[in-house]
A protein has these predicted regions:
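ABC ATPase NBD coupling module
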Residues: 36, 90-106, 135, 207-209
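Helix-to-loop junction immediately C-terminal to a conserved catalytic motif
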Residues: 73
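Conserved ABC transporter NBD signature motif
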Residues: 81-89
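Short coil-to-helix segment of the ABC ATPase nucleotide-binding domain corresponding to the Q-loop/switch region
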Residues: 118-125
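Conserved ABC ATPase signature
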Residues: 158-162, 166
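A short, proline-enriched helix->beta-strand linker immediately N-terminal to the Walker B motif
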Residues: 177-181
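Catalytic Walker B motif of ABC-type/P-loop ATPase nucleotide-binding domains
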Residues: 183-186
Length: 251
């Protein structure tokens, strides 16, 4: 695979916390989240994820997985506890800085979220344009990332002309085009057949090998068992297992 450039930094500085080793990507410290009216989604959740890790977050529906993602994206605030992403304490982050935080993250969702009236290349280019990239940079980066995901030959195809797996590859390309240090994946294989899912996971594994940290929420038992990566398991809002080379369920 062609060597990829180092992740780009955010254009403006954000509040940082001390990390002498510089090796930490995500920290949850005793995080609690209570939704109105008095519905507890997370209780006392603590974990640390280092840069370059590939981590699965598993658990039944309602276990708190989606809340973890929403907290990481600062869509919601924790009721108690502290969250650090890339050395930045999200509790100290002003609202005006949140777009800068999200610009330094990549997100991949189950339902692709592609613009239906745009080609694969235009979907990726649009995301770059929103982030303020020049036309020259867009012309350079879009073909490179489409080649990475194996869709250089489909750059002028619209979503309706692509299979589900191809649409997800475009979604991954859009999320990774600026080489973010952290890629957050919410059920990226949830709408795909098993064979297509394998290809998507192989692609995510290749991206992880470049140094990008990947946090992936999934219900795919077979995939988690096969890959033997770190597994964080949630149950009724509590962290019940954190295993370095785990399966979907405790062995």
């Amino acid at each position: 695979m062609t060597a990829l450039a180092e992740p780009e930094t955010i254009a403006e500085p954000l509040p940082a916390v001390a990390d002498p080793s510089g090796s930490t990507m995500i920290v949850f410290e005793s995080v609690k989240k209570v939704y109105e009216p008095n519905v507890t989604a997370l209780t006392g959740v603590s974990f640390t994820i280092d840069k370059g890790e590939f981590v699965f977050v598993v658990g039944a529906s309602g276990s708190g997985k989606s809340t973890v993602i929403r907290l990481l994206l600062k869509e919601i605030e924790p009721t108690e506890g502290r969250i650090i992403v890339g050395g930045r304490d999200l509790g100290r982050l002003k609202g005006s800085k949140v777009p800068l935080l999200r610009r330094n993250l990549g997100c991949v969702f189950q339902d692709f979220k592609l613009l239906p009236n745009r080609t694969a290349a235009e979907n990726i280019g649009y995301a770059l344009r929103v982030q303020g990239e020049s036309n020259a940079q867009i012309r350079k980066k879009v073909p490179e990332v489409l080649n990475l995901v194996g869709l250089a030959h489909k750059m002028n195809s619209r979503p309706e002309e692509l299979s589900g797996g191809e649409q997800q590859r475009v979604s991954i390309a859009r999320a990774f085009v600026n080489h973010p240090p952290l890629l957050i994946c919410d059920e990226p294989t949830g709408n795909l057949d098993p064979d297509t899912s394998v290809g998507i996971m192989q692609l995510l594994y290749r991206i992880n090998r470049t140094g990008t940290t990947i946090l992936m929420v999934t219900h795919d038992r077979e995939m988690v068992d096969k890959m033997r990566k770190r597994v964080i398991a949630l149950e009724a809002g509590r962290l019940v297992r954190d295993e370095r080379r785990g399966g979907y369920t405790e062995e």
